[in-house]
From Swiss-Prot:
Keyword GTP-binding: no
GO cellular component: mitochondrial intermembrane space
Pfam families: Cytochrom_C
Positions annotated to bind heme c: 28-29, 91
Protein name, as recorded: Cytochrome c
Keyword Iron-sulfur: no
Taxonomic lineage from the root: Eukaryota, Discoba, Euglenozoa, Kinetoplastea, Metakinetoplastina
Subcellular location: Mitochondrion intermembrane space
GO terms for MF: electron transfer activity; heme binding; metal ion binding
Length: 114
């Protein structure tokens, strides 16, 4: 499922992305090293990881079998409309329509690595 060609995202601001994450994603996801899964999987180390690979989380079949690697470009398309990108995903989030907000969240997610 490689993303279609699209305009590049604007530069992201990780601090703004952290605020957006806490306001829109932290209800379901944790983002700390070794953190427990919530309603959704822990997103620490997400960028560069294969989809469906966090131990102990019950992924949807669509997610577990997608073969997706979470690159910034893939995350951009996914975060815009998760259900369109990956039909069958368990993620109930409707998506982020503003490119700057997606860029900011992706910049934050890129900081979450050991």
């Amino acid at each position: 499922m490689p993303p279609k060609a699209r305009a590049p995202l604007p530069p992201g601001d990780a601090a703004r992305g952290e605020k957006l994450f806490k306001g829109r994603a932290a209800q379901c996801h944790t983002a700390n090293q070794g953190g427990a899964n919530g309603v959704g999987p822990n997103l620490y180390g997400l960028v560069g990881r294969h989809s469906g690979t966090i131990e102990g989380y019950a992924y949807s079949k669509a997610n577990a079998e997608s073969g997706v690697v979470w690159t910034p470009d893939v995350l951009d398309v996914y975060l815009e409309n998760p259900k369109k990108f990956m039909p069958g995903t368990k993620m109930s989030f409707a998506g982020m329509k503003k490119p700057q907000e997606r860029a900011d969240v992706i910049a934050y997610l890129e900081t979450l690595k050991g």
